């Protein structure tokens, strides 16, 4: 809701904005992914620019790389998303950059920890608990523990910290 976003920014006047909203529920619901991940990012970027925000922290996804050609994935790796989520999060990242506000983009995957109900670990847990089989493809996954993630965020929100894109 663009009006709500603008009102929040104009009333609160943040210096730093952490943009982590995302739609990732139904891979076939391209419209919802677009509304949340693209239009939502546009609303945040515009409101940030209008209201003098000094720094944006944007959560992207490692799915922006599609099927990586090499591991670990270097920042020079081309983006080639092939899912609605990956495509729309990548478009959202571009709108954050278009704002001209110094932006830290984090292309992370699989944050795990207490009360997180999405991702491979909760999925495996639910399947095993109900007696279903689990399957693993020939792939590699990165995992980031929530406590490490929060420690990093304490550092990242400081105005004098680096900007740019990081895996």
Stretch-by-stretch model annotation:
Residues 26-40, 74-81:
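Short alpha-helical oligomerization interface
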Residues 82, 94-155:
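NAD(P)-dependent short-chain dehydrogenase/reductase
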Residues 38-44, 86-96:
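Conserved catalytic Lys-bearing alpha helix of Rossmann-like short-chain dehydrogenase/reductases
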């Amino acid at each position: 809701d663009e009006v709500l976003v603008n009102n929040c920014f104009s009333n609160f006047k943040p210096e730093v904005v952490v943009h982590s909203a995302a739609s990732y529920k139904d891979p076939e619901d391209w419209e919802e992914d677009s509304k949340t991940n693209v239009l939502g990012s546009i609303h945040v970027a515009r409101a940030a620019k209008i209201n003098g925000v000094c720094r944006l922290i944007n959560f992207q996804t490692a799915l922006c790389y599609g099927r990586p050609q090499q591991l670990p994935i270097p920042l020079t790796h081309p983006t080639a998303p092939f899912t609605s989520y990956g495509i729309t999060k990548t478009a959202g990242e571009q709108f954050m950059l278009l704002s001209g506000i110094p932006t830290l983009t984090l292309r992370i995957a699989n944050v795990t920890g207490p009360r997180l109900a999405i991702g491979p670990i909760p999925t495996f847990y639910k399947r095993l608990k109900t007696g279903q089989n689990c399957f693993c493809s020939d792939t590699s996954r990165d995992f980031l523990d929530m406590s490490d993630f929060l420690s990093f965020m304490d550092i990242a929100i400081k105005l004098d910290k680096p900007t740019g894109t990081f895996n």
